[in-house]
Amino acid sequence: GMLAFGSTLVTATSANALTDDGYWGSETTVELQKRLNSIAAVNSAVEGGLPLDGQIDSQLASQSSANPGLTSGWQWVSDDAASGSDTIKDLQRWLGTDVDGLIGPSTISALQSWLGQTADGVLDGPSPAIVAFQRKLIEGNYS
């Protein structure tokens, strides 16, 4: 059901601190990492074994300002130094898109399409696609 305003203060220390606020930060990433590790057990395309650290390493700095919905835990580095993230690689494998470990328009569009959202390739702050993603992560609904 719907939670009342202010409830995040009460639930922040619970097992699942994720709220559907439309911003993809560390809490969203930890839930994604848990899910990808679970999927890896049944889907050989996904490698799993991800640390539950809430970090998305070595991402293209040029994507940061274009995607204000991506917040805590995202490491933005100069584009020529960006080597990508294992978490994003597994997300890309799961979505069936090109695997380079880097968030960008093609990966975002694939995620948006899977979520039934407009595939515009950007994640606003807040983002309707991130809200839908967070709801799937909270509910454990990945069909």
Predicted regions mapped to residue ranges:
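Cell-envelope/ECM-targeting effectors and their regulatory/trafficking segments
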Residues: 1-143
